[in-house]
Amino acid sequence: MRIKGLDGKEYNWNPSAVQAKAQSRSSLHLKAKELLDNLFPYDRILEEVSLVGSKTNRRKSILRADFFIPNRNLVVEVHGEQHYKFNNFFFKDKMSFYKAKARDSEKREWCELNDIQLIEFNYNEDIDEWRRKVE
């Protein structure tokens, strides 16, 4: 699959080959995985997929998507409270929080640039709201 990077270059992307090993997953992540498995029982659901071409001059690390469903050209992100509110558990300072918000924005930009649908599941929504976003 050809992908346009945030740097304007084109890349070959094989999402299956760029999955990270799932680390400890949050309860929200597990809940989202269960919902996606139920909604798309015959689709391959990839987790922690590297988004090629997402490095920038300001940020040298590559972005990752929580979930990617290739047959549906769909990225699903699970956003805990730390995506909306600063707290000392996740961030050492406010600058770290703002950098995380910038990464979320760059992920949206990457998906839009590549005509990939992005759905965000927010921590303060219930499972029915998540389901409605996907259906």
Give short role names for the model-derived ranges:
Residues 1-135:
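Nucleic-acid endo/exonuclease domains
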